[in-house]
């Protein structure tokens, strides 16, 4: 079963910023990043409970090949994507989004 995904605007901005940064470093790398994000989101949509809870209801899924993670909350039949964060960033920044 695929669950409904709602990507918060802040998470969309995170993905766009990372895409632009990777694309500026190496043309085509931004597109690879977006494909990796899409694959991660597909996995979350198929089985949102498979990923670790890291704070209250917030779960995280690591993005393959890139030092980023997806932060989300699963509530009944909907996944709310809160952020796409670089693993070296201060976790306090995403805590403000809860």
Segments predicted by a language model, with ranges:
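Arg/Lys-rich, positively charged N-terminal/basic patches that mediate binding to nucleic acids
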Residues: 1-34
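Solvent-exposed interaction patches of small proteins and small membrane subunits
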Residues: 30-32, 55-57, 89-92
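Enriched for short, Lys/Arg-rich terminal
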Residues: 69, 73-98
């Amino acid at each position: 079963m695929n669950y409904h995904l709602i990507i918060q605007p802040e998470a969309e901005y995170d993905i766009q910023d990372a895409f632009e940064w990777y694309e500026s470093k190496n043309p085509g790398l931004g597109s690879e990043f977006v494909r990796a994000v899409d694959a991660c989101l597909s996995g979350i949509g198929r089985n949102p409970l498979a990923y670790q809870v890291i704070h209250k209801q917030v779960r995280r899924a690591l993005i393959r090949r890139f030092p980023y993670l997806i932060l989300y909350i699963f509530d009944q039949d909907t996944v709310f994507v809160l952020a796409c964060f670089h693993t070296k960033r201060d976790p306090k920044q995403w805590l403000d989004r809860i």
